[in-house]
Swiss-Prot record:
Subunit and partners: Homodimer.
Gene: BADH1
EC numbers, comma separated: 1.2.1.8
Keywords assigned by UniProt, alphabetized: NAD, Oxidoreductase, Peroxisome
Organism superkingdom: Eukaryota
Source organism of the structure: Oryza sativa subsp. japonica (Rice)
Single biological process term from Gene Ontology: glycine betaine biosynthetic process from choline
Family listed: Belongs to the aldehyde dehydrogenase family.
Gene3D superfamilies tied to this protein: Aldehyde Dehydrogenase, Chain A, domain 1, Aldehyde Dehydrogenase, Chain A, domain 2
Protein name from the UniProt record: Betaine aldehyde dehydrogenase 1
Pathway: Amine and polyamine biosynthesis; betaine biosynthesis via choline pathway; betaine from betaine aldehyde: step 1/1
Annotated positions binding 4-aminobutanal: E262, L263, C296, W461
Active site: E262, C296
MF terms in GO: betaine-aldehyde dehydrogenase (NAD+) activity
Principal location: other
Length: 505
């Protein structure tokens, strides 16, 4: 598909329509594969956040919630299914925008759009099922009382999302929030906002009630921070860096506001000596080089049994050399650019520091020689790593994998858990009992056995330790946006009898 001659010029999507940012400022959109400026996005500030939150608040309570927050789940499901259908219709165009905006291979972006549509469809089904789960009875020990549970939308939610999977990560929050009956203000990363703005256009096309979903773009300090601190936002859901997540927690704590956080990771991949090496190498590659390694759950710490380490690394280098690194619009591209010049410089500094600290750059670590422009980095394999090195301890968020050897299962688990993070982990072995033991021992919210990075909308996603808390996807993702209310009634015709009635005069 040919690149469009111009990126659509969008405003902020507030109250069901487009409006220019209050200060009239816009931010350039740079194609990271070419370094060319291809358009711009509106730069929202606190005044725009106020308008968006007000629109969401109005939509939540309009006509007592009859049109959205208190409407039957089947009503909300109709809109979610309509959004999914539009995503499918526009799949090729949206994938192209995503590639131009973020630098990811077009094939990957197209797969992301399929996942976006599937996520909206899944939560449409859960919205419909929610009606049948209301008034769930609670068994009580006293016959003169009856009790049941209502699940109600938590209110207006602020959704702050990252740039690595721009529309998909937004959908992981938008779809369950809307299914629950919440109204929302979505603030995507300023580094990749184009497809999220197109979601606003889709909402307008399908007639989503005004204010149910509002989309503002801009800098984190100017748009994200006012959203996180707004007193009329009932919950914040954030995916991004651990440092930003800490600031959001501090802000929310001042108002006792619930938050869910999906933050950084430094996930391990443990490979034992009983594996098919080429199969395991491909999973190691996919676990750290897909999406140019810009994945929060990337298995960027590779732990190899000492008996196979040399053979494994020889094959890993051979496979890494075979990756097609190119303009992400080219057919067969498997490694595009990273998202921005800032991210490029950050990754290159990690590699430089690893070298200075005594690690070995076994392969990669530089710009591909055939690509003179764009923010491209070769797949990078780093060995002779100690556990005190920055490359072992900190999230790189790029196509960089560091390697250590182990001798025993116990040592492998200790190395795997030697991190402040706890998002994911993986183990590859033909001994399934060993895999089960390790899946219990790894301190993370997700464990993969004989694979790395599969993600299904039906299964919970989230981490432990400094990787955050709360779970997205599946029923757990819907529960993020629901408040549980207990309703108990007294059913006897007799007085309760706790107090003695006053004497009759």
């Amino acid at each position: 598909m040919a690149a469009p001659s111009a990126i659509p010029r969008r405003g902020l999507f507030i109250g069901g329509g487009w409006r220019e940012p209050s200060l009239g400022r816009r931010l350039p959109v740079v194609n990271p594969a070419t370094e060319a400026t291809i358009g711009d996005i509106p730069a929202a500030t606190a005044e725009d956040v106020e308008l968006a939150v007000s629109a969401a608040r109005d939509a939540f309570g309009r006509d007592g919630g009859r049109h959205w927050s208190r409407a039957p789940g089947a009503v909300r499901a109709k809109y979610l299914k309509a959004i999914a259908a539009k995503i499918k219709d526009k799949k090729s165009y949206l994938a192209l925008l995503e590639t131009l905006d973020s630098g990811k291979p077009l094939d990957e972006a197209a797969g992301d759009m399929e996942d976006v549509a599937a996520c909206f469809e899944y939560y449409a089904d859960l919205a419909e099922a929610l009606d049948g789960k209301q008034r769930a009875p609670i068994s009580l020990p006293m016959e003169n009382f009856e009790s049941y549970v209502l699940k109600e939308p938590i209110g207006v939610v602020g959704l702050i999302t990252p740039w690595n999977y721009p529309l998909l990560m937004a959908t992981w929050k938008v779809a369950p929030a809307l299914a629950a009956g919440c109204t929302a203000v979505l603030k995507p990363s300023e580094l990749a906002s184009l497809t999220c703005l197109e979601l606003g256009g889709i909402c307008a096309e399908i007639g989503l009630p005004p204010g149910v979903l509002n989309i503002i773009t801009g800098l984190g300090t100017e748009a994200g921070a006012p959203l996180a601190s707004h007193p009329h936002v009932d919950k914040i859901a954030f995916t991004g860096s651990t440092e930003t997540g800490k600031r959001i927690m501090i802000t929310a704590s001042q108002m006792v506001k619930p938050v869910s956080l999906e933050l950084g990771g430094k996930s391990p991949l443990i490979v034992f000596d009983d594996v098919d090496i080429d199969k395991a190498v491909e999973w190691a590659m996919f676990g750290c080089f897909a999406n140019a390694g810009q994945v929060c759950s990337a298995t960027s710490r590779l732990l190899l049994h000492e008996k196979i380490a040399k053979r494994f690394l020889d094959r890993l280098v051979a496979w890494a050399k075979s990756i097609k690194i190119s303009d992400p619009l080219e057919e067969g591209c498997r490694l595009g650019s990273v998202v921005s010049e800032g991210q490029y410089q950050k990754i290159m500094k990690f590699i430089s520091t690893a070298r200075c600290e005594g690690a070995t750059i076994l392969y990669g670590g530089a710009r591909p020689q055939h690509l003179k422009r764009g923010f491209f980095i070769e797949p990078t394999i780093i060995t002779n790593v100690s556990t005190s090195m920055q490359i072992w301890r900190e999230e790189v968020f790029g196509p960089v994998i560091c390697v250590k050897e182990f001798r025993t299962e116990r040592e492998a688990v200790e190395l795997a858990n030697d991190t402040h993070y706890g998002l994911a982990g993986a183990v590859i072995s033909n001994d399934l009992e060993r895999c089960e033991r390790i899946s219990k021992a790894i301190q993370s919210g997700i464990v993969w056995i004989n694979c790395s990075q599969p993600c299904f909308v039906q299964a919970p996603w989230g981490g432990n330790k400094r990787s955050g808390f709360g779970r997205e996807l599946g029923q757990w993702g819907l529960d993020n946006y629901l408040s549980v209310k207990q309703v108990t009634k007294y059913c006897s015709d007799e007085p309760y009898g706790w107090y003695r009635p006053p004497s009759k005069l």
